[in-house]
Amino acid sequence: MNTRLLSIAGCSWAVAGLMAALLTPSVTAADPPPLERVQTIALKGPVGGLDHLAVDARRGRLFVANTVNNTLDIVDLKAGKLLKQVPGQGGIRGIDYSAEVDRVFVGNGTGGVCNTFDGDTYELIKSVPLGDDADNVRYNPGARRIYVVHADTELSVIDARDYTLRSPIALPKGLGAFKLEAGRPRMYANAKEGHVMVIDTDKDEVIGRFPVAPAGVNAAVAVDEPNHRLFIGCRKNPALVVMDSDTGKIVASVPIPGDVDDLSFDARRGRIYASCGEGAIAVIRQIDPDRYESLATIPTTGRARTSIFNAEAGQLYLAVPRSADRPDQVNPEVWVYQARP
């Protein structure tokens, strides 16, 4: 692998942008790809969008928000096939799975509800109405709370013990993806006007606001907790922005394709995977906490922009909507990529 460094630590943004544009990696034919597509799994549904995914690693199950079909799709990863579709999930968008409580949490945009399902039987346990446009969902096992993006400006908080609503967390318009730390009571929420909101999950209060400029429309987030690094995927001036999770200081920026929607951090291999609706997965290597380089750009297909990484299997799952532009594609799909080496 003959790659050239894209770190911008200690450089001005202008110089960094020029360097990032000029110094692109070159991959020889002998190099194995960092991600190899190994399987295609067919779902069912019409032309239209898919949204977020979640993984039950113990059972080998993948959950897919089949938005256009209004179903929660459950994939058997071992068999490589669609296992079940749970109907009645109007405009399903966000999904999270918690092994600690063996529950699947779903945010439905139409009708704005958060549904909780049994992780074994997939029976509905509780439906909590929030109002229109429920979206991303995360479960906090320490506090036993469910967080749901709602109405584009609010983070609804549900007590998972009795499913009562707590006081919501008001945030700037354009609220998108968010991520919780496992080791301390911190949450990082993307406000797409150009800030990452830092939230204390013990108090459910905003305690910080980190700008991502000159990038913007920050849509995706991942965390490297041991090294105190935030990875922010931005659609304006498309880039992976790396910042100190304690101070908000930007330490690096690497160009990526447009329309990013999901990021995953592969801690074992020191990589970040960015799935982009422009038709590619960007693979970025972490040299050290302050230095990063573009390792590869894996071609995919247009509008396939949501994904999740299964660390136990070393696999990335990409949601590929059924498209009118691909008449040979008769179903929405999940593309399975194996991380190499």
Language model regions located:
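N-terminal secretory signal peptides that target proteins for export/translocation
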Residues: 1-9
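Terminal low-complexity, poorly structured segments
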Residues: 1-2, 14, 18-19, 31
